Amino acid sequence: MAPSLDSISHSFANGVASAKQAVNGASTNLAVAGSHLPTTQVTQVDIVEKMLAAPTDSTLELDGYSLNLGDVVSAARKGRPVRVKDSDEIRSKIDKSVEFLRSQLSMSVYGVTTGFGGSADTRTEDAISLQKALLEHQLCGVLPSSFDSFRLGRGLENSLPLEVVRGAMTIRVNSLTRGHSAVRLVVLEALTNFLNHGITPIVPLRGTISASGDLSPLSYIAAAISGHPDSKVHVVHEGKEKILYAREAMALFNLEPVVLGPKEGLGLVNGTAVSASMATLALHDAHMLSLLSQSLTAMTVEAMVGHAGSFHPFLHDVTRPHPTQIEVAGNIRKLLEGSRFAVHHEEEVKVKDDEGILRQDRYPLRTSPQWLGPLVSDLIHAHAVLTIEAGQSTTDNPLIDVENKTSHHGGNFQAAAVANTMEKTRLGLAQIGKLNFTQLTEMLNAGMNRGLPSCLAAEDPSLSYHCKGLDIAAAAYTSELGHLANPVTTHVQPAEMANQAVNSLALISARRTTESNDVLSLLLATHLYCVLQAIDLRAIEFEFKKQFGPAIVSLIDQHFGSAMTGSNLRDELVEKVNKTLAKRLEQTNSYDLVPRWHDAFSFAAGTVVEVLSSTSLSLAAVNAWKVAAAESAISLTRQVRETFWSAASTSSPALSYLSPRTQILYAFVREELGVKARRGDVFLGKQEVTIGSNVSKIYEAIKSGRINNVLLKMLA
């Protein structure tokens, strides 16, 4: 048995989530090191691993109790075959509910012998015609009035995505399989036949308030399987996508329309399946975006030469043991293991030794587990809620208790549980976006990015503004995410003769959440593009430093060796010159190459004069050293750059600096997607593929799910 939602919420409130019993059917005990707080906590990685492991080719058997969200996604997006489980118990429950309803046809039964909603004061003995009347008034959505729009490649902008309709059909069959709804097995098989033959009803995008379930959208599904003459469907036949009337599509596959019996129209349309389907798909994508956000955070730490200590277990497991904060910190810590960019251990220094150096990373990196942890908690909770809603719930009305031979009039169709998960998820998406946006802008800002070139220009910044446009675009995406985060559920209007005076607006909220996923995908694709460029530029910097360290010593010996004879000034001079150069170079990363190095050594010359003031040093020697050192640095920089770019065409030298796990994402983008680091059109003297086209490749990999297993491999 799955735990109740109350028990899940209670365990979350105590930092001990039992949601895994609803999601995985099992528990994992995680001892929190040093905190003395044993927890039973499903992790987000567990959830994603299970979702992505859902098969796509084996038949999904629906029994009303075991459907999980990965199954819904595989049926909705991958066309996984679906059927009602071949079980005597299931057939018996369904048959008994139908028989019980038939025994009540002389009684006043809502939606069987009465009218609907605020019209439930009407009565009829024509139960079959009543179901037709139900569909008639609910088939009221706006779709193209002719096939011309479809032929011109338009017409679907006001219809639900086909994957949402397929997911809704899967969830609805699963719910009706429970035998609480008096809908015959032949009707369920009509739905699975549509799914398995790739016949998908065209359903209006708008027009439901998700109160008595999603009445109008589900009516279009019911109309299609019953062969309504004006019902349109999408089908793939002989390798071609077509929009046909439902009867035409059924004829292609020798399918017969079903005639809906008493309550069967109501049993099909009165439920939360459409909202639950769109919410499930939105949540699946939100999980993936959350993992991508964590991965980008780790890679930004690397690009910014940030501190792995921000994710130390003492900070999270011991001193603030929120389970999802622990998880996020652990994920990022794992991603940084073995990185040569990230600072893993920092020696304590005296007050004056690191003057002018930022002592710790800024909030977007340092507090990312504390920021993302609560959002991950909301996603895990939403997963538990939707697992119950899609896999273990009957959501129409009235419901039949076969064992006790009674019917119950209630409101399981009120989709507030779904709506609330979407409200929280959408708010979380905006907060994820805000975090990644601030990480991105810090990385692009020459005054904050620890010496990376302005706008991540690979060559002279005066003629390359590489990521400046992306900076602006990212601000637009983040602003839109903030707007979309506004609540939907506060905009309820009384409807249907004020009978549905409160309504969940779950599908509208799920639609807005799907939009947020899309916008966040754009933002994270932008971030990923930029962080890889930053990593490449940081690798060039590190390669340069390896070679320039000995060169500095050699130049100092060459120009000042005689002045330092018999003294202990050499080591002091080398150390102070290096510090002066590092500090000045970080302040001048918007300069072009040549003036930047001449400026840096002009500052370093002052350090030379200061250290060697007690010697016989001449100003001519200092000036000669200054010019020679600057020219040497300029020459070496160009040499290192050329070596890097030549090697990057095969296997980038940056890989050796990244952690083994972040190497996976770097290689996926650079090699599999073919998005290369950019030197600049002006420098190369030709116009290359646009920046936007390269970001688009990453965006498409996110939207298609191509990146999903890459992220799981990184975090497994």
Swiss-Prot record:
It comes from the Eukaryota. It is found in: Cytoplasm. The modification 2,3-didehydroalanine (Ser) is found at residue 212. It is an enzyme of class 4 (lyase). One of its GO terms (molecular function) is tyrosine ammonia-lyase activity. Keywords: Cytoplasm, Lyase, Phenylalanine catabolism, Phenylpropanoid metabolism. The keyword Cytoplasm applies. GO terms for biological process: cinnamic acid biosynthetic process; L-phenylalanine catabolic process. GO terms for cellular component: cytoplasm. Transmembrane segments: none annotated. Its main location: cytoplasm. Optimum pH is 8.5. It catalyses: L-phenylalanine = (E)-cinnamate + NH4(+); L-tyrosine = (E)-4-coumarate + NH4(+). (E)-cinnamate binds at residues 270, 360, 366, 397, 468, 496, 499. Belongs to the PAL/histidase family. Homotetramer. Dimer of dimers. This is Phenylalanine/tyrosine ammonia-lyase. It comes from Rhodotorula toruloides (Yeast).
